[in-house]
Amino acid sequence: MRRPMVAGNWKMHGTRASVAELTEGLSNLALPSGVEVAVFPPALFINQVIDGLAGKEITVGAQNSAVQPEQGALTGEVAPEQLVEAGCKLVLIGHSERRQVIGETDEVLNRKFAAAQAKGLKPVLCIGETLEEREAGKTLEVVGRQLSSIIEAFGVKAFANAVIAYEPVWAIGTGLTATPQQAQDVHAAIRGQLAAEDAEVAAKVQLLYGGSVKAANAAELFGMPDIDGGLIGGASLNADEFGAICRAAGN
């Protein structure tokens, strides 16, 4: 039985004051015990959030990490080693904004994935298609290629210690959302691709949906058999809204 997971990606939002307010709101939530809850604050606020959530069942992760596991001469980056020391347990790899805006390639993301696992960080691999790719009927081709990049480099068992988030690029921050059935179809294809390599890994890996998830649509999305929770963007910046999404996952 896969444990539901709800992860909040705060992206490049927050000041010291607003992060303190959000963290306090999260610490006061009554969260369902069966749901794995995580937040990914900007790197500058990771320590503040970890301190503010001390004693709470909320995991803190990083939005990005370096291509090498250890600290060293790599200006502007944060090493997995450093994130682990700070208290992080998870790291986002390949979010569409990193792929589309920063230009990170599958090769770069493979290195980040491996570096994170080498230091005990669990990667949350983000995959998904653009609107143009969906309209061209290439959704499964694109998602399959992004998944295959990791499988070919490290083997499918790399996903025994990873999470996968399907996030259609056209549904991120646009207000557009894949229908529950559209999302389920892609999630089923992802799980099927993994199962062709290793049925046990496929059955256990958590598959999250990301793309304008909010309290109003979370329950219907999370009710799909291959959707194990969500990677939440804007709605995670409101503690009450995020709490409602977590409760939807618990149901």
UniProtKB/Swiss-Prot annotation:
In which residues is substrate bound?
9-11, 173, 212, 233-234
Which keywords fit this entry according to its UniProt record?
Cytoplasm, Gluconeogenesis, Glycolysis, Isomerase
Q: Does the keyword section mention S-adenosyl-L-methionine?
A: no
Checking Gene3D superfamilies in the record gives: Aldolase class I
Record: active site: 95, 167
Q: InterPro entries, per this entry?
A: Aldolase_TIM, TIM_sf, TrioseP_Isoase_bac/euk, Triosephosphate_isomerase, Triosephosphate_isomerase_AS
Task: Provide any one GO MF term from the record.
Answer: triose-phosphate isomerase activity
Q: Where in the cell is it found?
A: Cytoplasm
User: Which EC class, in a word?
Assistant: isomerase
Q: Tell me the function of this protein.
A: Involved in the gluconeogenesis. Catalyzes stereospecifically the conversion of dihydroxyacetone phosphate (DHAP) to D-glyceraldehyde-3-phosphate (G3P).
Family statement drawn from the similarity comment of this UniProt entry:
Belongs to the triosephosphate isomerase family.
Oligomeric state and interaction partners are given as: Homodimer.
Per its record, how is this protein called by name? Triosephosphate isomerase
State the species of origin. Pseudomonas putida (strain GB-1)
User: In the UniProt record, what gene is named as encoding this protein?
Assistant: tpiA
